[in-house]
Amino acid sequence: MEAIISFAGIGINYKKLQSKLQHNFGRLLKALTVTARALPGQPKHIAIRQETAFTLQGEYIYFPILLRKQFEMFNMVYTAHPVSLRALPCVETEFPLFNYQQEMVDKIHKKLLSPYGRFYLHLNTGLGKTRIAISIIQKLLYPTLVIVPTKAIQIQWIDELTLLLPHLRVAAYNNAACKKKDMTSKEYDVIVGIINTLRKKPEQFFEPFGLVVLDEAHELHSPENYKIFWKIQLSRILGLSATPLDRPDGMDKIIIHHLGQPQRTVSPTTTFSGYVREIEYQGHPDFVSPVCINEKVSAIATIDKLLQDPSRIQLVVNEAKRLYSLHTAEPHKWGTDEPYGIIIFVEFRKLLEIFYQALSKEFKDVQIIVPEVALLCGGVSNTALSQAHSASIILLTYGYGRRGISFKHMTSIIMATPRRNNMEQILGRITRQGSDEKKVRIVVDIKDTLSPLSSQVYDRHRIYKKKGYPIFKCSASYQQPYSSNEVLIWDPYNESCLACTTTPPSPSKQKHT
């Protein structure tokens, strides 16, 4: 049987393959279809999403090249689209890697040497996925396209590439660059582009790239972003992710058909001291009742209602003041000679401005950066992102901040709204590889005791215990938005511990895994 290999993958005549497989044809297509799991509170009128690891183009059905072994029994005769790749300049440049990074570089390099090589790297947040990928770029010496989800991550890639591989011509590909001229791999050795822009490019744009790096690869499951896979099949592909199979709806499984099963590395031994301050908050009755849609609790609408409580907003401000006061008044006590940085996470963009206004009234002389707010106006500025690296307080949504944004001076988190998913990535914002291990990490977690979302705290407890962070409980209410003294409810070294304390705990050492 004849087949073609092109940008879109392995193309086989639809009718001939159907005739060859007969009743197994339907089974094959079913096996290559991922159906989303229904989420709690999801309205019934919203259709259950499906995505397929095949696509139809005219008389042909295309499959990911990774699946070509499944067709070996048919003695396939392939006609491949010709690809001519130039070699990047070979300059001996060395930069340090940890042992676990070097081991993974060797493993990835071996896999990507072969044409159409694929590798899906699973490495926890803050452990240097970018540096591993840059080492692969240096070894393969192919023109490379790096695809990232946000401008903030794009800037980080540009900075890291320029620092580690200064001899290469590196460029950022975005809407502004598109208007000036059409960048190609002939002009640049490495192009770093944002998915929202690159997914609109024709197949021919991707032809000159011998290597494509997909940062935050698990996020390419969305209907629009997923289309990129049917344009890059001729390249070697390296996918990077801290949470490759972590979506509640399971749609990130579709990525496996293109990249293979995620491969983990040996855990490093970086340690961080830290603890959790859990505040049990009793909100005003007007704001804690659940919001139901189609007789099911809607988490989004319920969170929106919770944050209409002015006392709850004041509680977050008070906690920020408390952290800032501790860090600035007694930095030596907390293991540092300079103030900490504080990240405040919220669920929705519209809450960023609400908290910004509330914080600005209390922190008149403190730099507060909201790098995401500018996105509402068409794009975050380079200036705002640059300022964020020295800001004392940063406001982010969970969706934006959980991606690989690196602020190494940030060591405290306030979770201003409830959260269940992506907790590994959220905590990773304050446990970046290369940041100061001596600084104590602090997580402020607000549990809305009268809300149906309060049970989500137990999912967070599971992650805290995995990290080895003791949990200290205190209370507050809409009548008294100042948290009480702390009570130790869990200690990684003493499960039965229930000791009272009003001073910062002796933090545990967390192995960064």
Swiss-Prot record:
InterPro entries in alphabetical order: Helicase/UvrB_N, Helicase_ATP-bd, Helicase_Restrict-Modif_Enz, P-loop_NTPase
Gene3D superfamilies tied to this protein: P-loop containing nucleotide triphosphate hydrolases
Annotated family: Belongs to the DEAD box helicase family. DEAH subfamily.
Enzyme class name: hydrolase
Binding residue positions for ATP: 123-130
Pfam families linked: ResIII
KW Nucleotide-binding (keyword) present: yes
Molecular-function annotations in GO: ATP binding; ATP hydrolysis activity; DNA binding; RNA helicase activity
Name of this protein: Putative ATP-dependent RNA helicase QP509L
SMART domains named in the record: DEXDc (SM00487)
Record PROSITE patterns: DEAH_ATP_HELICASE (PS00690), HELICASE_ATP_BIND_1 (PS51192)
Induction info: Expressed in the late phase of the viral replicative cycle.
Keyword vocabulary terms for this entry: ATP-binding, Helicase, Hydrolase, Late protein, Nucleotide-binding
Alphabetized SUPFAM superfamilies for the sequence: P-loop containing nucleoside triphosphate hydrolases
Residue span(s) of domain Helicase ATP-binding: 110-262
DEAH box, short sequence motif: residues: 215-218
EC number: 3.6.4.13
Reaction(s) catalysed by this chain's protein: ATP + H2O = ADP + phosphate + H(+)
Highest taxon listed in the record's lineage: Viruses
